[in-house]
Amino acid sequence: MNEHNIVRVRDVMTPDVKTIDRMQTVAEAIEMMRHTGVSSLIVERRNENDEFGLIVVSDIATKVIGPDKSPDRVNVYDVMTKPVITVHEDMDIRYAVRLLGHFRISRALVIDHMRPPLGIVTLRDMVLRHGQSS
C-alpha cells in the first residue's frame, strides 16, 4: 500500500455521534439507542478538563440486564467506560486497528486536534474497508 492508497480513519468513521449525559438512566440510554439505531453512545464530558465516556449495548447487558438490575435505577456513569480510547481522524486505519486490537475493544471515538467528537470508528468498518483497498 503506497502513500496514495492510505485509508484514514475519517474515511470510514460514522460521523453522526449520539451523546448522552452521564446522569441519565440506562433506560434512557436504551431508548435513545433504540430510537437512533445505534449500539453505542458517547457520554458527554462534565467540563473541558474531563474525558469522554462510552456506553455500549454489551455494557448494559453485562452490568444491568444480566445482574437483573432495573435500567430505570442505574445511571449511565455506573456502567460506562471512561476514558474512551480516541483516535485522530488522520490516523491510518492499519494503526487504528492495531490500537483497538491491543486494548481488545471494537470501537473508538474519533477526534481532531481540537478534541470534539467527530465520529465513531469500529473494527468492522476498518477491516471491511481495508479489504476493499488491498
At which residue positions do the language-model features occur?
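Tandem CBS (Bateman) regulatory domains
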Residues: 1-15, 52-85, 92-105, 117-134
